[in-house]
């Protein structure tokens, strides 16, 4: 418990204590519920919500109920509040049947979900729907942002090159924080640029000799396995 939650200690003094976790989770739940009620144009009863929240806190503190593990880990954090609730999901699924129209976006979506810890399932319905192409390599430079979104966007760009012949710039990895540096948004430490460089090289090796061929089910599986 302490090992998984210490990065969310509000005072950054070490391991988050149980009462802090309970407060964070309950406040996060009710803040999310309040936003949803307002979005639907419904009435919010603050006094009733306070009573219910206090009861939920007491029951959680005494282990009469618990949210899922990801709820204990992520609910009420800035990550969920500022970057949607994707980090609360355990599993997701994405079909590749619309690969011909959505191209690299499908794999970028799966990569984004995987990078917030979601287990992602997929199919191979997109097999045979596009011809692999040679990217239009340019001398432009894309400085990859030091963020999950930056990594995902770079893979999206590369795959669109092979799926639609789009332009692919030179990738600049210099902005990515070094291995071992802290990751403040999602917690943990950085792996450095190495894994992303390896992913770009592996995807390029997979498709570079298949120009003109129809994408196969094996290609789809290999692409997602390289990403995941």
Feature-to-residue mapping (PLM):
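Extended catalytic cores of very large enzyme megasubunits
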Residues: 1-228
């Amino acid at each position: 418990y302490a090992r998984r939650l210490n990065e969310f200690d509000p005072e950054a003094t070490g391991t988050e204590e149980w009462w802090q976790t309970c407060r964070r989770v309950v406040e996060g739940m009710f803040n999310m519920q309040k936003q949803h009620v307002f979005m639907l144009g419904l009435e919010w009863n603050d006094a009733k919500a306070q009573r219910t929240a206090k009861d939920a806190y007491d029951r959680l503190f005494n282990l009469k109920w618990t949210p899922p593990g990801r709820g204990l880990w992520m609910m009420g954090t800035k990550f969920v509040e500022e970057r949607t609730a994707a980090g609360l999901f355990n599993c997701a699924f994405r079909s590749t049947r619309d690969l011909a129209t959505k191209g690299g976006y499908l794999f970028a979506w799966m990569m984004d979900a995987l990078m917030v810890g979601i287990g992602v399932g997929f199919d191979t319905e997109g097999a045979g729907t596009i011809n692999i192409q040679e990217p239009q390599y340019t001398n432009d430079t894309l400085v990859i942002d030091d963020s999950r979104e930056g990594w995902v966007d770079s893979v999206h760009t590369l795959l669109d090159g092979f799926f639609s012949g789009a332009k692919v710039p030179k990738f600049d990895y210099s902005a990515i924080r070094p291995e071992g540096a802290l990751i403040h948004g999602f917690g943990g430490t950085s792996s450095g640029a190495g894994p992303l460089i390896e992913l770009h090289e592996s995807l390029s090796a997979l498709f570079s000799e298949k120009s003109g061929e129809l994408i196969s089910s094996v290609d789809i599986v290999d692409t997602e396995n390289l990403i995941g």
